[in-house]
């Protein structure tokens, strides 16, 4: 029996699944840290912080930056900085700075992963409704989808500000299934991180885990999705469609 024969709709995560957003996110994080005279983190480190929304991204960035600054000052024989504003207030300021800078660099710092457009197009042509579920702040989502020319594929889009509980809570996925008019078990959810797989399990949705995303440096198989794929277009044969041969480049 085909594991996905009862699927009537497909929903996707965004960052690390459909798009490589790390360059833009890392640039905005580092500009915000620099503006507060804190150490900058770099893309390789920021990648491990992506996936839980901007507020938690800021908390992780600030925690690391304050610790890094203390370590650097200690190696130079300087006392730790003891006149910081409270961390909660600093996170709030950092988030405002991040939002401003990310708005400037999001489009030029985000790229489609290979096979995204042709896979979405094939699924849409089959008549499957497609949804997007992301923890990314909602104001950034629609402009980014339009800039990448993939907004046209989605009938339902849920951003991080559209629900009270973000992934890994099931609420965003349940909302998408409801708007599609299908049961959760009829909606396949495709993601790259443990948050995605946990949300799918909690919602009762079958799940696909992709190996190429961020996932905090962990292997996706540790989250035990129903199926693991190396490439997004590996999904097509499982849904009765021919495997895409269109070789999209990351920078298309």
Swiss-Prot record:
GO cellular component terms, A-Z: cytosol
UniProt binding sites for Mg(2+): 13, 15, 192
EC number(s) on file: 3.1.3.18
Needed cofactors: Mg(2+); chloride
SUPFAM superfamilies (UniProt xref): HAD-like (SSF56784)
Keywords annotated in UniProt: Carbohydrate metabolism, Chloride, Hydrolase, Magnesium, Metal-binding
GO MF, one annotated term: metal ion binding
One record GO biological process: DNA repair
Enzyme class: hydrolase
InterPro entries in the record: HAD-like_hydrolase_sf (IPR050155), HAD-like_sf (IPR036412), HAD-SF_hydro_IA (IPR006439), HAD_sf (IPR023214), PGP-like_dom2 (IPR023198), PGPase_prok (IPR037512)
Catalytic residues, chain numbering: 13
Listed Gene3D superfamilies: HAD superfamily/HAD-like (3.40.50.1000), Putative phosphatase, domain 2 (1.10.150.240)
UniProt pathway: Organic acid metabolism; glycolate biosynthesis; glycolate from 2-phosphoglycolate: step 1/1
Pfam families, per database record: Hydrolase
Family per similarity comment: Belongs to the HAD-like hydrolase superfamily. CbbY/CbbZ/Gph/YieH family.
Subunit structure, interactors included: Monomer.
Function: Specifically catalyzes the dephosphorylation of 2-phosphoglycolate. Is involved in the dissimilation of the intracellular 2-phosphoglycolate formed during the DNA repair of 3'-phosphoglycolate ends, a major class of DNA lesions induced by oxidative stress.
PANTHER family referenced in this protein's UniProt entry, alphabetically: PHOSPHOGLYCOLATE PHOSPHATASE
Stated name of the protein: Phosphoglycolate phosphatase
Lineage of the organism: Bacteria, Pseudomonadati, Pseudomonadota, Gammaproteobacteria, Enterobacterales
């Amino acid at each position: 029996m085909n594991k996905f024969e009862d699927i009537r709709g497909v929903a996707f995560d965004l960052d690390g699944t459909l798009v490589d957003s790390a360059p833009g996110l890392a640039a905005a994080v580092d500009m915000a840290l620099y503006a507060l005279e804190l150490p900058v983190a770099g893309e390789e480190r920021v990648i491990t912080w992506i996936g839980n929304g901007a507020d938690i991204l800021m908390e992780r960035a600030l925690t690391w930056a304050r610790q890094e600054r203390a370590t650097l000052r200690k190696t130079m024989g300087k006392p730790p900085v003891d006149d910081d504003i409270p961390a909660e207030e600093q996170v709030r300021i950092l988030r405002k700075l991040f939002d401003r800078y990310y708005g400037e660099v999001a489009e030029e710092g985000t790229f489609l992963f290979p096979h995204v457009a042709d896979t979405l197009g094939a699924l849409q042509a089959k008549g499957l409704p497609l949804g997007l579920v992301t923890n990314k702040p909602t104001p950034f989502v629609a402009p980014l989808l339009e800039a990448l020319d993939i907004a046209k594929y989605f009938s339902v889009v849920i951003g991080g500000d559209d629900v009270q509980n973000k992934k890994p809570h099931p609420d965003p996925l349940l909302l998408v299934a409801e708007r599609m008019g299908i049961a959760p078990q009829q909606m396949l959810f495709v993601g790259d991180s443990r948050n995605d797989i946990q949300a799918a399990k909690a919602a009762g949705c079958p799940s696909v885990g992709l190996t190429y995303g961020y996932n905090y440096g962990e292997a996706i198989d540790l989250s035990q999705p129903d199926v693991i794929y190396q490439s997004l277009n590996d999904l097509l044969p499982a849904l009765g469609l021919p495997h895409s041969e269109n070789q999209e480049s990351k920078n298309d």
